A protein has these predicted regions:
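Conserved MFS/SLC helix-loop-helix module at the cytosolic interface between two early adjacent transmembrane helices
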Residues: 97-136
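A late C-terminal transmembrane helix in Major Facilitator Superfamily
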Residues: 358-403, 408
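Cytoplasmic helix-loop-helix junction between adjacent transmembrane helices
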Residues: 142-178
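Transmembrane alpha-helices of Major Facilitator/SLC transporters
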Residues: 286-309, 323
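Helix-loop-helix hairpin linking two adjacent transmembrane segments in secondary transporters
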Residues: 167, 172-219
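Helix-breaking motifs and short loop linkers at transmembrane-helix boundaries and internal kinks
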Residues: 79, 111, 132-137, 197, ...
Length: 438
């Protein structure tokens, strides 16, 4: 099973019989055999339908990162500190993990379109919470709903894009749609907030318009899944890491944790770094820096497919080390160039590490435990995107944001170095390990 994963988003496997994923692409076994799109190759697929599915995916994921350049404005308006910014951000991960564990395979059981529509409605409700500007409770509610939406959307949309894309580009198509959406969210919000009126309203109103268009396209898409008849009971999915998978799961999960921690740093507090340390208050620039991280991750994931997981995984850790050294230097020297360079290098490292970790774990896990194992991997990854960044916020109350960022950078460098060295020493045995017989 070859995994091609987008970032906090999805990770498809390629080939016929695409499977429904969890929030960031956890592969869940299909409930009813071959998807309808494969059975109707002449009518189910096509460039317009594939483009429509990719647009739906990108628009939905853009909502999860849309608030990134705006947190500083909320902080000024509502009077809370950097710690609360990171807590508001991290609530998103709670929603994603809950959706992953409860509803990761619902699109197999109910069909792609119903789950996509539910995800878009949740995303619209999230945007509505931000539009109301009702203080911290609505910000928390908006972020939680955004996490639920991402959890539902990534599984169903990844599968839909895979099933509608041309055969040779399925994995990259889903990855590009996911990462493109995640990157365009802060870029769109930053540009609108900087150069248009009503900076806390217009980005979310624009997103609602895009969501309406995505909903209309979803209704026009062919149903690519064949839900079983009668429909099975909807029940939560479990997590399980079989004993034979644990030797590769532990380092792969640590690499995912570290890579997602870098994502969390940039999507939660990099605008604060730029304002407080680099004295750059342009929100469009802040959004562009975050955009560069996700674009770089896409490049890293593409390179991972060509390099091979046993080599790409330790190389990804090396990229995370170099990237965070550059971020630390940017904070010490007040250099935007070093911050952008660190964003790109760290993003490439995250992409290499994440996709190769997915590939390694999914290949080693037996078929009957694959969904639960990958679910566990994503729980670790989303803990990485939330817990460390809350630590940065907590440290900033006593040390200041600059010093908290330096401590974070040092911790990531230490963890990624240790995991990378471990993976490099064991790469030959990992490459030689046989895949389970399904």
């Amino acid at each position: 099973m070859r995994s091609a994963t987008p970032g906090p988003g999805s990770g498809p496997s390629e080939g016929r019989g695409a499977r429904s994923r969890g929030p960031a692409g956890a592969a869940h076994p299909a409930a009813a055999g071959e998807p309808a799109a494969d059975a109707e190759d002449g009518t189910g697929r096509g460039p317009l339908r594939y483009a429509a599915a990719a647009f739906v995916f990108a628009v939905g994921m853009a909502g999860t990162t849309l608030p990134t350049p705006l947190y500083g404005l909320y902080r000024q308006e509502l009077g809370f500190g950097e710690l609360m910014v990171t807590v508001v951000f991290a609530v998103y991960a709670v929603g994603v993990i809950a959706a992953l564990l409860v509803a990761g395979d619902y699109s197999d059981k109910l069909g792609r379109r119903p789950v996509l529509l539910a995800a878009l409605l949740l995303s619209a409700a999230s945007a509505g919470c931000f539009l109301l500007e009702g203080g911290l409770p609505l910000l928390f509610c908006g972020r939680l709903l955004s996490g639920f939406a991402a959890g539902l959307l990534s599984g169903a949309a990844t599968a839909a894009v895979l099933e509608l894309a041309p055969g040779g580009s399925r994995g990259f198509a889903a990855t590009a749609a996911n990462m493109g959406g995640l990157g365009c969210g802060p870029l769109l919000a930053g540009v609108l907030a900087q150069y248009a009126p009503r900076p806390l309203t217009l980005p979310f109103a624009t997103h609602l318009v895009l969501l309406a268009a995505a909903g209309a396209l979803t209704l026009a898409l062919p149903e690519t899944a064949r839900p079983p008849r009668p429909r099975p009971r909807l029940r939560p999915r479990g997590m399980e890491v079989p004993r034979q998978v644990r030797p590769v799961f532990v380092p792969a999960a640590l690499a995912c944790f570290t890579g997602f921690a870098v994502f969390g740093l940039f999507t939660a507090v990099s605008p604060g770094f730029m304002s407080a340390t680099l004295h750059i208050g342009n929100l469009a620039v802040s959004g562009a820096v975050v955009f560069s991280v996700f674009c770089a991750s896409l490049l890293g994931q593409s390179a991972s497919a060509r390099t091979g997981a046993p080599v790409a995984l330790p190389l990804g850790c090396l990229g995370l080390v170099v990237g965070m050294v550059q971020v630390g230097l940017s904070l010490l020297l007040g250099s935007l160039v070093l911050l952008v360079t660190g964003a790109v290098t760290g993003g490439i490292g995250q992409g290499l590490a994440f996709r190769s970790a997915m590939t390694t774990v999914s290949r080693r896990a037996p078929e009957e435990h694959r969904g639960g194992t990958i679910s566990a991997l994503f729980v670790v990854a989303y803990l990485g995107i939330s817990l460390p960044v809350v630590g940065v916020g907590a440290l900033s109350t006593g040390l200041g944001l600059r010093n908290a960022g330096l401590v974070f950078s040092a911790c990531v460098v230490a963890l990624a170095s240790g995991v990378g060295a471990w993976l490099w020493r064991t790469r030959k045995s990992a490459a030689a390990a046989p895949a389970p017989v399904d």
